A protein has these predicted regions:
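Phosphate-ester processing/binding pockets and catalytic centers
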Residues: 1-221
Length: 221
């Protein structure tokens, strides 16, 4: 709980699923999921407890990365996440990459498009009750790519009309980022493999979704 006079910070942890290969060898879809919380210690602690439980049972799956975890580990992670309904909200943005114009066929361009959409959603949906916003992205971009990404996204972030900070931090090193990983993967599976079960298993968490090319009519590849 935030005390009187304390800064109310909204934390946004973002991860992606899919790749940036815009050929027939690449994925058909790309997804980012953002986990919103003003109590990141609570959500991280829940997964930290699970991590130590797994360690005690001699498991070697101590990083929660949905594509790499066993089915049993995924089930346990999902169960823990479902219990965080009072602590987190999630917003996922997805695209059928075939509708992406050639000008978007790069990691910076694609992530910039998604980042701007995410910033607009934060401003409208959840940013008003906080004094500042901290966004934590996975470290998928290199140094120069991050500079280009920030240049593209900053105008949308300034529309928040409150202080903001953007950090790049490996998901494998942050438990809240690993929650975002699970949602991104679940949405991706529902689109790419027509497998709704992982997403259905996360029922109970407030989770909105947005198709960034919902008005698209032209397939470019």
């Amino acid at each position: 709980m935030t005390g009187v006079g304390e800064v109310r910070t909204l934390y946004v942890f973002v991860d992606e699923s899919g790749n940036f290969d815009f050929t027939n060898k690449g994925t058909d879809h790309f997804v980012i999921s953002a986990v919103f919380t003003d109590d990141p210690c609570r959500s991280a602690a829940a997964l930290q407890t699970l991590k130590y439980d797994l360690l005690a049972s001699r498991s070697d799956q101590l990083e929660f990365h949905a594509t790499e975890n066993s089915r049993g580990t995924r089930a346990r992670v999902t169960q823990v996440i479902r219990e965080l309904s009072q602590c987190i909200r999630v917003h996922s943005i997805y695209a059928d990459k075939h509708y992406a114009h050639r000008s978007l066929h790069s990691p910076v361009a694609m992530l910039s498009l998604f980042g701007k959409a995410l910033a607009r959603w934060v401003a409208v949906a959840v940013g008003g009750n906080h004094d500042q916003v901290v966004l934590v992205f996975d470290s998928v971009l290199t140094g120069k790519q991050r500079d280009a990404f920030m240049k593209a996204v900053k105008p949308a972030l300034k529309a928040l009309e409150k202080p903001f900070h953007v950090a790049f931090h490996p998901v494998k090193s942050d438990l809240n980022g690993q929650i975002a990983d699970y949602f991104a993967w679940s949405v991706f599976r529902s689109l790419e493999a027509k497998d709704p079960l992982p997403l259905e298993a996360l029922v109970g968490i407030s989770h909105s979704k947005f198709n960034i090319f919902e008005r698209g009519h032209t397939r470019y590849w």
